[in-house]
Each structure stands twice: as structure tokens, then as C-alpha cells.
A protein has these predicted regions:
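PLP-dependent amino-acid enzyme catalytic core
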Residues: 1-496
Length: 496
């Protein structure tokens, strides 16, 4: 059966999976969603014997129905290979009473690798399928991790260029170095004088600018997105929740059909939305627990039914979640409204004009699958410290947000289901924050010195991603103001 996609803001018009991947964002500013979420084509018991690559094919072929078996298997083989430092791709670590799904074993040691190692291949395959002659320009805003993972994925991929914008003082030193040292003739990195929301809004504005689209087309270019608004990012993320369940079955940690909970540190809502899709496919997930840092706009939304970004933006030690406009939430809003494109459009217009919106009581009742919590900066540091002291396991700041929220949820709800926590980045990526949580004496020390200390205390091997930036030369030093983003893109592409 052919699965088509439609915009959250227009129920009428449909496109194929490859067209949705190419476009990134729908013409009306909405996000592409499948007309229906497919069911898993195999039993849960059959999953447990499969490798990561086999589960990826089993899940993704249901969503990407216009890809041939050969095309999809080729994309998967190119993505999930020796770039990952473990054959399992996303191993589970049992620590205390939870299972940490380590999504940081890829090229840039963050969970974004899981989707961004395959997106370039899905995109170039989609371009061939749709006879696209233009060069594809990937335009991305990053709060730290997406940028590097996208750069690594697209570096020297034929027929593509990639331009990444990041907030000048809004990412960690390691994250910045990972980006500005990126090799590849088709890569560009730009620091903006502003925050992540400015970067994301600027990128979105360029996507929606018809005049710019025309100018680029005349020069032989067209935009696509590597941000989590692209369905080609979301579908590969569904895979690892299916895989986690399969691993628990294989390791006899759960019985077949036993329900589990999932906790996800959440910013842009893509990662937890993928878990929601896995649940809808038939994976027995009871609660989806949304973990926020002090930018707790999502926590407040789940508590009150009102989404309100009119608040102070807090810079925390978990920068990938320092987000007030959670763009993937729109896909959930659309679903809980009964797929009412008009209602979704009205709410998103309110968000744009007023900075807030409130959902109906009926819609709020459809959020029963979700629970939410948030962690303060002190709680994050204490969680890293306590779990290290008790078990020797070292986690990064984003994972600690989730661990703290899980602990509070478990105490409040008395829900003792087996729980998978999405561990979204390597502690090496945030060595400064992690080491000062373990012992305050490390506060303010040089990041690279702390990386060595972290290696000693954790007893883990230094990831390649860190070794690479130790001595790499800086290749990108462009900066611009928020209102110069469009001109900067034109300059990079040589468009007048």
C-alpha cells in the first residue's frame, strides 16, 4: 500500500514520502504527517531476533512506501555502519532501575546522528526519484547537536550543499569546535548574534520566502531542511524505540506485550514524537514522559493545556533543550485535534501573533498518553553526581534532566513499569558541566583538561569525535546579525 503525506494545515493535498522529504516544510508552513500511522508488519516476538539494520528496514519501509527495497536497504547500509562505535548502534545500559538507551555512539556523539546519518541518502534518493536537477541546499538552525550531525552527514555528499546557523554564545565549546572545524567542500557554518529561536525563525522565514525560492531556482539551487521538521528525520527516529523494545525482549528483561514507559529529554519535540509514533505502530508503550529543563514551556503545556512562549529564555547546562518554540509539537496538536487542519492553523497563527494558544478540553483529554516533568539546574547537577557516586555511570546533562524527571514521576505515580530513558548525548560533549557536577572543584577549568579527567573517572574510551577536534584547524569563521541571514546565504551560494 502506498502511504501518502499531508500538511498539518491542509487536509486535502497529499504528497509521496520522497516529495515530503525533499520539501521539508509544506508550502502552507505546516509540517508533513503520514495520512495514517502504519502498524508494525511483524509480531513483537519476531523483532527480538533482528539487528538494528533489519528493524530499521522493517519500520521505515512502512513509512517510505515509494522507496524500492533496494533503495531503502542501500540508504540503511550507508548510514548504520562503522561510523558507529558499536555494532548494536543504540545499546541499552541498565543502571539502577532504568534502561538508558545510548543514542550517542555515532559520528558526532549525540542522538541526532541516528537520523542524520541516513537523511542525506534518503534525500539524494528522493531527488533522483523526482527528477530534481537543482543542487539541494540544506539550511539548518542548530542549538548545538543538529548542526554538527547534519554537517557530518552531508559533507561531500554529491548534489548537496549545507549551511548551518548557530547562536554565537548559545552552544558549548566542544559543540562549537565540532562545527567550525568541519571538513567538506560543500559545508558552511555561520554564527549569528542571537539565540536559537532567532536562528530557527530566520531559517523558517527563508523557507517561506517565495521570492528567494525563485532567485535560487534560477541559479540552480533549491532548499531542503535537515531540522527535525523534516519527516526524513522523524521516521528513522521511530526505529530506535522499536529496537529498544526488541532488545528488552531479547535480554528477557520484559515479557512479550509487557508495557514499558519511555522518558525523553525534550526540546523541539521530535524525539518524543518518534516514541509516540512507535506506540501508535503497536509497541506497548504506556507513558511517554516529556522531560524539560528550566525552559519548561512543554511541561506547562502538558499541565495546563496552554502553550506560552512569552517568558524569559534561560541558558542552561542542557543547551539542546533551550527552546521556547517547540516546532514538532504541531504534529501532536494536529493529531489530538482529530486531524483538524483548520484548528491547527488557527492555533499556530495565535502562536505566531500572540506567542501563546490554549487547546480545548477535548484535545487535552487526548494527551493521556503523556506525562511531563522538569528539572532545575541544581537537580541536574545532583542527578549526575548521585548516579555517578552510586553506580559509576556517567551521563550528560540532557540525560540527567530525563533521569531526574523519571525519579520524580516514579515517586509521585508509584508506576513501576520498566522504563527506557533516551540518553541523548555523550558526557564528553558537555565535559565542563558533567565534571563540575561530579565535583565542584572542576568548575571553570578548561574543557579539554576536563575531558581527560572525565576519561579517568568514567573509565570509558575517548570517542573519535573528541579526538578529531583536539588539533583540527578552524575552517569556518563567518558571523552575522539575525537580519543578515538571507544575505549571508546568498553570498555563500554566489547568488546576486
Amino acid at each position: 500500500m502506498n502511504l501518502l503525506y499531508k500538511s498539518t494545515r491542509d487536509a486535502e493535498k497529499t504528497v509521496t514520502a520522497s516529495q515530503a522529504i525533499l520539501k521539508g516544510l509544506a508550502d502552507d508552513g505546516g509540517l508533513f504527517v503520514p495520512v495514517s500511522i502504519p502498524k508494525l508488519p511483524v509480531s513483537l516476538g519476531e523483532l527480538k531476533e533482528m539487528t538494528y539494520q533489519e528493524i530499521a528496514y522493517t519500520v521505515m519501509k512502512e513509512f517510505l512506501t515509494d522507496f524500492t527495497e533496494e533503495e531503502l536497504k542501500s540508504c540503511i547500509a550507508k548510514a548504520y555502519d562503522s561510523k558507529f562505535d558499536t555494532e548494536e548502534i543504540a545499546p541499552l545500559a541498565k543502571v539502577e532501575d532504568a534502561y538508558y538507551m545510548e543514542l550517542f555512539h555515532g559520528a558526532t556523539i549525540a542522538f541526532k546522528d541516528m537520523a542524520l546519518s541516513i537523511l542525506p541518502h534518503l534525500l539524494t534518493t528522493s531527488a533522483k526519484k523526482n527528477q530534481v536537477k537543482n543542487e539541494i541546499v540544506i539550511l539548518t538552525a542548530t542549538s548545538g547537536d543538529t548542526g554538527k550531525a547534519a554537517l557530518a552527514g552531508f559533507a561531500d555528499v554529491e548534489g548537496t550543499k549545507i549551511i548551518v546557523f548557530y547562536p554565537k554564545n548559545g552552544v558549548s565549546r566542544v559543540q562549537e569546535l565540532q562545527m567550525v572545524t568541519q571538513k567538506g567542500d560543500n559545508t558552511s557554518v555561520v554564527a549569528i548574534h542571537g539565540n536559537f529561536d532567532n536562528a530557527q525563525s530566520g531559517v523558517k522565514a527563508m523557507f517561506e520566502n517565495k521570492e528567494l525560492e525563485k532567485e535560487l531556482n534560477e541559479a540552480g539551487y533549491q532548499f531542503s531542511s535537515a531540522n527535525s521538521i523534516n519527516i526524513g528525520r522523524l521516521v528513522p527516529q521511530v526505529v530506535y524505540y522499536v529496537y529498544a523494545y526488541a532488545k528488552l525482549l531479547q535480554n528477557e528483561e520484559i515479557a512479550e506485550d509487557e508495557e514499558i514507559n519511555v522518558v525523553v529529554p525534550t526540546g523541539n519535540f521530535g524525539n518524543i514524537l518518534a516514541a509516540y509514533y512507535a506506540k501508535n505502530m503497536g509497541i506497548p508503550i504506556a507513558k511517554l514522559i516529556c522531560a524539560s529543563n528550566e525552559n519548561k514551556v512543554l511541561y506547562d503545556f502538558f499541565q495546563t493545556g496552554t502553550y506560552d512562549r512569552n517568558r524569559e529564555f534561560v541558558l542552561t547546562t542542557s543547551p539542546s533543550m533551550d527552546i521556547l518554540i517547540s516546532s514538532n509539537l504541531e504534529r501532536l496538536i494536529y493529531k489530538i485535534s482529530g486531524e483538524d487542519a483548520r484548528k491547527d492553523t488557527d492555533l499556530m497563527t495565535e502562536l505566531k501573533t500572540k506567542g501563546s494558544y490554549a487547546i480545548t478540553g477535548e484535545m487535552k483529554a487526548n494527551l493521556a498518553d503523556f506525562a511531563a516533568g522538569y528539572a532545575t539546574e541544581d537537580q541536574v547537577a545532583k542527578t549526575i553526581h548521585d548516579i555517578y557516586e552510586d553506580t559509576g555511570y556517567v551521563m550528560d546533562t540532557h540525560t540527567a534532566v530525563a533521569a531526574m524527571v523519571y525519579k520524580a514521576y516514579r515517586e509521585d505515580s508509584k508506576d513501576d513499569r520498566k522504563t527506557v530513558i533516551a540518553s541523548t548525548a555523550s558526557p564528553y560533549k558537555f565535559a565542563g558541566s558533567v565534571m563540575s557536577a561530579i565535583d565542584p572543584k572542576y568548575k571553570g577549568q578548561d574543557d579539554f583538561k576536563l575531558i581527560e579527567e572525565l576519561q579517568k573517572v568514567s573509565g570509558t574510551e575517548l570517542p573519535n569525535a573528541i579526538k578529531e577536534i583536539m588539533n583540527a584547524e578552524i575552517r569556518h569563521n563567518t558571523e552575522c546579525d539575525v537580519d543578515q541571514m538571507e544575505q549571508t546565504v546568498k553570498n555563500i551560494l554566489g547568488v546576486k
